[in-house]
Amino acid sequence: MSHFPKLLSSQIAYDVARTMLDGFDKHYRLFREVSIEAKARFEVGDWHGLQQLQRDRIAFYNQRVHETIVTLQDEYDAEDIEDEIWQQIKLHYIGLLTNHHQPELAETFFNSVFTRIQHRSYFNNDFIFVRPAISTEYIENEESPIKPTYRAYYPGSREGMAACFERIVNNFQLERPFEDLKRDAGYVARAITEHFGEFRIAPNFQVHTLSSLFFRNKTAFVIGRVINGDHTYPLVVPIIHAASGKLVLDTVLLHREQILILFSFAHAYFMVDMEIPSAYVTFLRDLLPRKSRAEIYTSLGLQKQGKNLFYRDFLHHLQHSSDKFISAPGIKGLVMLVFTLPSFPYVFKVIRDFFPAPKETTRELVKSKYQLVKQHDRVGRMADTLEYSDVAFPLSRFDDALVRELEQHAPSMIEYQRSKQGEDEIVVRHVYIERRMTPLNIWLQEGTDEQVDHGILEYGNAVKELIAANIFPGDMLYKNFGVTRHGRVVFYDYDEIEYLTDCNVRRVPAPRNEEEEMSGEVWYTVRPHDIFPETYGTFLLGDPRVRAAFMRHHPDFFDAAMWQHHKDRLLAGHVHDFFAYHSQERFIHRYGSGATGPATEEPRRAA
């Protein structure tokens, strides 16, 4: 039962609510400014600038939360505000959000501020937004006609599609000229005809495109949908810099699976300017019904909102399931304890209190590695993580063996409490949550010859794409990689990662005498950050099927020259091209030399 006050009698309550909303409004204004700046950086080809924008934006949220807390402490002694006043603060805040264009994000910001001031015993709907209070439906009706959430175009006929797409692209007003937009728009129309065949044009035949471009890595994406009769189809057109220095439309993506990969949890967040983010999410969910709202908000760079929605989805799942959390199957890690709920497609990772040999690390160092991944372009090859503190789980849902494992190996990370409903709970002080995947070592052990071949092809591609993005995985055992439902290999164990540019790529020196040659021990000096690619075969090529696949697809993997080549390019300032689709889909391959490739090289497929 709610205990909200009947009267809003406190001026301080209103002032605090206003201060908190001002903090959020500042955050979202800066968030949008970065997204607008991304367009300018893309136009001039400032790839390092785009990467810096991405890193800066990730830090914005916590900076604004901290600023708001400092203001509340200085002006209102926030820690001493009485419970009844906090309830009035929430009600005032709801009132201030009535006509707000980002109410769901503002509610999450309120939660972030409050939960860093008050004890977790207050984390309920009387004080924070456990459930949303303001609807986000149809907010777009109040948008400016100058830039609505999406624009509608009417080709009129199959023959009118090329001119329609030319108009769509021109409406984004990119400052850099196109190499041949008429040609590329014709390719888009041709690809659509090839995909759908000679389809019948319905009276409602139209194309909708979101009004802002989606920026990531070195690509700008037009995101849209085609409506014809009762059917809706996704449509994505990537725009890249060509070798000529001008812009080209690289391809058109029309398969829903392709779009799912584009919005995968293994990719960096998009930078996109949104006045009404909930309207963008609604549009994208129409294209990707299998994606949760939490996943889509996260892909749009609103990871705190995604994290909030994920937790609500998780609580809902707990209410409607009865299985128990268990220790995750597979080889135990030396740094993390990993557990899972079989009915829920995620794993929970807790840093151990003690690290057995040969691991030499600390809790803070491990957390810094995970933060590095959060800020880096994951190029479709590193799983995103959700980081939570003080998460309360029903103790009755934990397997006894898992509880003993946590008590033995991570006692400082857990405590017990009783909920307001009188239920025993286990509180995990710090946890990472990741999408559950099939460990690659299990995939290779149990797979058919064809699956093994695919797994090794993907593994080699994943490592090569990571080092091209300046990430050295460190521990490259197969158990540290997973296979997604799309068959892609993704890295997910980050405690040993380093920047490749910080590593010394070395060849094993020749033995100086017979004793060294016959020695089972390393006879040469190994310094910190030294890597010896030719030694990796010792722990990667034990299985004959794996060895055959490796030699077939990646014979250069164990050659130090390949690794040094990537390092040299990175040190020279090169930014690699990573696209989340097969190179065969590109117009340059489909329609010949008239379609020009990127300014540097053939992009890797990062999907």
UniProtKB/Swiss-Prot annotation:
The active site is at 384. Keywords: ATP-binding, Cytoplasm, Glyoxylate bypass, Hydrolase, Kinase, Nucleotide-binding, Protein phosphatase, Serine/threonine-protein kinase, Transferase, Tricarboxylic acid cycle. InterPro entries: AceK_kinase, AceK_regulatory, Isocitrate_DH_AceK. Signal peptide: none annotated. Pfam families: AceK_kinase, AceK_regulatory. The keyword Nucleotide-binding applies. It catalyses: L-seryl-[isocitrate dehydrogenase] + ATP = O-phospho-L-seryl-[isocitrate dehydrogenase] + ADP + H(+). GO terms for molecular function: [isocitrate dehydrogenase (NADP+)] kinase activity; AMP binding; ATP binding; phosphoprotein phosphatase activity; protein serine/threonine kinase activity. The keyword Hydrolase applies. One of its GO terms (cellular component) is cytoplasm. ATP binds at residues 328-334, 349. GO terms for biological process: glucose metabolic process; glyoxylate cycle; tricarboxylic acid cycle. Its EC number is 2.7.11.5, 3.1.3.-. It comes from the Bacteria. It is found in: Cytoplasm. Belongs to the AceK family. Bifunctional enzyme which can phosphorylate or dephosphorylate isocitrate dehydrogenase (IDH) on a specific serine residue. This is a regulatory mechanism which enables bacteria to bypass the Krebs cycle via the glyoxylate shunt in response to the source of carbon. When bacteria are grown on glucose, IDH is fully active and unphosphorylated, but when grown on acetate or ethanol, the activity of IDH declines drastically concomitant with its phosphorylation. This is Isocitrate dehydrogenase kinase/phosphatase.
